[in-house]
């Protein structure tokens, strides 16, 4: 059994999360900014389908990408040099999260419900949630979004409508975070794709101990400048 949360965001210790399914910690609560920010600071995130209550997770181990450790293949470096995409920060957050919410397969479902979308749009308005966008001729063709707290970035989802569009966005994110002194990008669940890009598994205890410091250091909330994205692009040309 897992606890049912209500009232204040008083999450149980992450050590109480289930092993099967890995990381399931609690149910209930809200998707308000106070709840979401309290969760992320503790290494907890929401993930559930539309027919479920809000479920809170903290898997062990945790997949983490150190910004400086991102692996860029030769073909991706060539794409970056050729400037095939214009990369922007925080100009189309609603469009990015809507694209991420589209089912990956015809008839498939999505965990990014309208409720989730509204919650993260609110965090974007408050300066905590950010989008990194890849554009071609004024059309959004890829990107990602996530939460920035102190020196930690919590990646949520990405999408791509053209080859390398989301990878280019990730490269710009990592470069931007490295400039700002961020310690880590939380990738949440382990996937072969993210491992190939340089992400590594970190014991949950170590990850959460890091968060206790990272989320209380570094820059505060606020919009990211598109000029910073343009500077990063020029460095690859």
Curated annotation (Swiss-Prot):
Q: Main subcellular localization, coarse class?
A: cytoplasm
Catalytic reaction equation(s):
N-terminal L-lysyl-[protein] + L-leucyl-tRNA(Leu) = N-terminal L-leucyl-L-lysyl-[protein] + tRNA(Leu) + H(+); N-terminal L-arginyl-[protein] + L-leucyl-tRNA(Leu) = N-terminal L-leucyl-L-arginyl-[protein] + tRNA(Leu) + H(+); L-phenylalanyl-tRNA(Phe) + an N-terminal L-alpha-aminoacyl-[protein] = an N-terminal L-phenylalanyl-L-alpha-aminoacyl-[protein] + tRNA(Phe)
Report the coiled-coil segments.
Answer: none
* InterPro entries linked to this entry: Acyl_CoA_acyltransferase, Leu/Phe-tRNA_Trfase, Leu/Phe-tRNA_Trfase_C, Leu/Phe-tRNA_Trfase_N
Subcellular location per UniProt equals: Cytoplasm
Q: Name one GO molecular function term.
A: leucyl-tRNA--protein transferase activity
In the UniProt record, does the keyword Protein transport occur?
A: no
Query: Superkingdom of this entry's organism?
Result: Bacteria
Q: Which GO terms describe its biological process?
A: protein catabolic process
E.C. number, please?
A: 2.3.2.6
What sections of the protein cross the membrane? none
What NCBIfam families is this protein classified in?
Answer: aat
Q: Protein name, please?
A: Leucyl/phenylalanyl-tRNA--protein transferase
Organism name: Aromatoleum aromaticum (strain DSM 19018 / LMG 30748 / EbN1) (Azoarcus sp. (strain EbN1))
């Amino acid at each position: 059994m897992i606890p049912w949360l209500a009232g204040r965001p008083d999450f149980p210790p992450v050590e109480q999360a289930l092993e099967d399914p890995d990381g399931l910690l609690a149910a209930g609560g809200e998707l308000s900014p106070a709840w979401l920010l309290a969760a992320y600071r503790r290494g907890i995130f929401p993930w559930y389908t539309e027919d479920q209550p809000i479920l809170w997770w903290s898997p062990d181990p945790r997949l983490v990408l150190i910004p400086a450790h991102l692996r860029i293949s030769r073909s991706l470096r060539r794409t970056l040099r050729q400037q095939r995409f214009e990369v922007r920060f925080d100009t189309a957050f609603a469009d990015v999260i809507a694209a991420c919410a589209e089912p990956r397969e015809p008839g498939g479902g999505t965990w990014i419900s309208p409720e989730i979308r509204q919650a993260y749009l609110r965090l974007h308005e408050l300066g905590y949630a950010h989008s990194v966008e890849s554009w071609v001729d004024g059309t959004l063709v890829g990107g990602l979004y996530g939460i920035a707290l102190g020196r930690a970035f919590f990646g949520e989802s990405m999408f791509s409508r053209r080859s390398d569009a989301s990878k280019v966005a990730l490269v710009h994110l990592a470069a931007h975070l490295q400039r700002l002194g961020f310690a880590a990008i939380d990738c949440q669940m382990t996937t072969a794709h993210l491992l190939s890009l340089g992400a590594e598994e970190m014991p949950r205890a170590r990850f959460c101990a890091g968060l206790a410091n990272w989320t209380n250091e570094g820059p505060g909330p606020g919009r990211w400048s598109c000029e910073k994205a343009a500077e990063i692009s020029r460095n690859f040309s």
